[in-house]
Amino acid sequence: MRRSLASLVVGLAVVVALAGVAAADDGGRPLSTTLTGAEEAPGPGDPNATGQSDLTLNQGQNEVCFDISWADVDGTVFAGHIHVAPAGDPGPIVVSLFSGSFTGTDSVSGCVENVDAELIKAIRHDPSAYYVNVHSRPNFPGGAVRGQLGH
């Protein structure tokens, strides 16, 4: 009887541990979007610039990984963010992806840790309510290129 109870307890512990690992490593959800100056709001953004944003939202790890590239942005790129707002509207920053000093044709990748799991869940549930944009100085500090997620 003791052996059966001990086996049951060990078996349950293994199942719980494996469930926790599966939740923590959810494989992430990829989201990609094309970035253009025409998408910026309020516009105009950079009319000659383009870009690409590839995100992986890892809810169980509280992490957003990104690979963002852009071309022909006027000035110096200094930041990239995820904002919350529908297409055509500006919105507040919800995740700061990168900052620094980059050329008008460049790329950057990395992961942002300690992102609220509920925010990641919300983005995964309704990606079209969020957008990625890249900011440049001196002409487009509010955003040079933008792409709505889920489109």
Report the location of each language-model feature.
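Metal-centered catalytic cores of metalloenzymes
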Residues: 2-80, 84-151
